[in-house]
Swiss-Prot record:
This is Glyceraldehyde-3-phosphate dehydrogenase. The keyword ATP-binding does not apply. It comes from Pyrococcus abyssi (strain GE5 / Orsay). It is an enzyme of class 1 (oxidoreductase). Its main location: cytoplasm. One of its GO terms (biological process) is lysine biosynthetic process via diaminopimelate. D-glyceraldehyde 3-phosphate binds at residues 140-142, 192-193. The keyword RNA-binding does not apply. The lineage of its organism: Archaea, Methanobacteriati, Methanobacteriota, Thermococci, Thermococcales.
Length: 334
């Protein structure tokens, strides 16, 4: 059985998820939805992907430039089993009634509130909770990054404190900033901690800053331990955790710039780094406190989660099998 998949929103996340779907042997990409005939819409068409307008209102935008679409979102919903909603934050919740009316399952993204779905999802942490569900929310890039590493050491963690150093905008985004400032999130603790708790039960508080960079987020994590753990133990745990990679400053990984260059050297599409990058030298244990620093490629770390979410919703595979299939199809290193 191949699950028929549509992607609503063909931007930063949507186009990466659409690409990932085409790499799965148990899924079929039926079409993608756009609001306007921009370069991404033209590229989708060049790739042979059917393009649909978001609704009747937006059809004129395509017609005015002679861009032939296959119909509207409603037409696409008649042809799919599940829709991946990769629209801007808050839009997914507005779209949900359309999916319910069409009887189509939906995967939402982290820009939506948790109550949009039956479960918030990170594959290696709570895959089983999404089995057979109709509405699943893949959590944000930051939350996914935190959950990947914290879940691996969860049995040792008593309380987590994390500082999120967030990129200001994606590389193609000219509307956001700042470009010459550091912007604190003055709502303390920040929303990231409660979002982690929608996936795993863990005590966590976070703070966040936005800085003038586009390529990655960085997390500075401190964990109060309830059970003894050595630096070597943590290194061993992370080395054996899927979708987490250790990078060494000694080998030239001094910043996020070198980590992204590593992703480029892998010749991956859009220099995706699906894995969470942890600086090996930053891992340290002092008394009952564990410290480490990690980087998150905000454009791609959630992509494999979307694929695994679909498998769980349709019960196509168990957790280990799905993660293994997704990793292999996308060239994820471990």
């Amino acid at each position: 059985m191949k699950v028929k998949v549509g992607v609503n929103g063909y931007g930063t996340i949507g186009k990466r998820v659409a690409y990932a779907i085409t790499k799965q042997d148990d899924m079929e990409l039926v079409g993608v939805v756009k609001t306007k005939p921009d370069f991404e819409a033209y590229r989708a068409k060049e790739l042979g992907i059917p393009v649909y307008a978001a609704n009747e209102e937006f059809l004129s935008r395509f017609e005015s430039v002679g861009f032939e679409v296959e119909g509207t979102l409603n037409d696409l919903l008649e042809k799919v089993d599940v829709i991946v909603d990769a629209t801007p934050g808050g839009v997914g919740a507005k779209n949900k009634p359309l999916y319910e009316k069409a009887g189509v399952k939906a995967v939402f993204q982290g820009g939506e509130k948790a109550n949009v779905a039956e479960v918030s999802f990170v594959a290696q942490a709570n895959y089983e909770k999404a089995l057979g569900k109709s509405y699943v929310r893949v959590v944000s890039c930051n939350t996914t990054g935190l959950v990947r590493t914290l879940n691996a050491i969860r049995e040792y963690a008593d309380y987590v404190y994390a500082v999120m150093i967030r990129r200001a905008a994606d590389p193609n985004d000219i509307k956001r900033g700042p470009i010459n400032a550091i912007k604190p999130s003055v709502e303390v603790p920040s929303h990231h901690g409660p979002d982690v708790q929608t996936v795993i039960p863990i005590n966590i508080e976070t703070m966040a800053f936005v800085v003038p960079t586009t390529i990655m987020h960085v997390h500075s994590v401190m964990v109060e331990l309830k059970k003894p753990l050595t630096r070597e133990d943590v290194i061993d745990i992370f080395e054996n955790t899927t979708r987490v990679l250790l990078f060494e400053k000694e080998k030239g990984f001094e910043s996020t710039a070198q980590i992204i260059e590593f992703a480029r050297d892998l010749h991956r599409e859009w220099n995706n780094l699906y894995e969470i990058a942890v600086w090996k030298e930053s891992i340290n244990v002092k008394g009952n406190r564990l410290y480490y620093i990690q980087a998150v490629h905000q454009e791609s770390d959630v992509v494999p989660e979307n694929v695994d979410a679909i498998r769980a919703m349709f019960e196509l595979a168990d957790k280990e099998e799905s993660i293994k299939k997704t990793n292999k199809s996308l060239g994820i290193l471990k």
